């Protein structure tokens, strides 16, 4: 079923209300319902291409509003998990975890670590994966106390991030950060 932008916004707000109020369980709403309903901010910018002189100008404004948010489809997350085959002792991180789609396919929730900048997506991830170690933070400030066996994720793309090393594209910064937090081979 395809929802309009307005319907998606309203559904996202209802999900957040259920989590904030603690009424999801008492109303019979399951974690699976929350997982399937919350879509995040991607595509909810309300911009129209016709209002911009170029596709580039439209795309830049869209990136600014959405902050690069796009939740990885569950089938892709499942494929990644099946390809990696993490064991029950492997510790897995997603440095821009969104609502935690990759965690859904990991063998042990308490071995999942995530960082998320968007407070709403973080709230949903925390609700869905209460055993995971999640941090509401910018990936650039994320300093975990341990190293990981695997880093999975779908970083924001083509955002210009300013770091102590200068300007970097977000996806390249993600790769550098992943290398820093992975266990040595």
Annotated model-derived regions:
Residues 1-185:
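Class I S-adenosyl-L-methionine-dependent methyltransferase catalytic core
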